[in-house]
Amino acid sequence: MANKRVFIAFAIEDEKYRVFLVGQAKHDNSPFEFIDMSVKQPWDTNWKTNCRARVKGCDGLVALISKNTANADGELWEVECAYEEGIPVMLMWINDERPALPSLLNDKRINIWSWPNLETFIGNL
């Protein structure tokens, strides 16, 4: 499978899960691989412009969903940006908690974090 460019959207409080996801993709037995295009450091005042350009340059976006997502304005903007740009989006729970969701995500399917789910999403990009 060729590497796909994947933007990872996450609440800053959930950064360790982004690290886990990137690590999973590098594991020898991983059924998927991708190039992490997430924003790892805060942008300057033009961050939305820079972020939109980065999202548009990706094959897909994986959003890590948690109790922190509802208050993660940056993450929600990144997900909304992907929807607006027609970039495929996979929403994925980071754990077993199922908190209230922001309206942007209310009618969306949220996947369980698993290798098969990631492999299917990334393989279909």
What would you call each of these model-derived segments?
Residues M1-G57, I87, I94-N95:
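Conserved N-terminal substructure of TIR/SEFIR domains
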Residues Y17, A72, R98-P102:
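Switch/connector loops and helix/strand junctions flanking conserved nucleotide-binding motifs
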Residues T45-K48, L76, W115:
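Structural motif corresponding to alpha-helix initiation and N-cap regions
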Residues G60-A63:
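Inter-motif core of Ras-like GTPase G domains
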Residues K67-E85:
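Conserved TIR/SEFIR loop-to-helix hotspot centered on a Trp-containing motif
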Residues D96-N111:
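Glycine-rich, charge-decorated loop segments at or immediately adjacent to ligand/cofactor-binding or catalytic sites
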Residues W113-L125:
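C-terminal helix of von Willebrand factor
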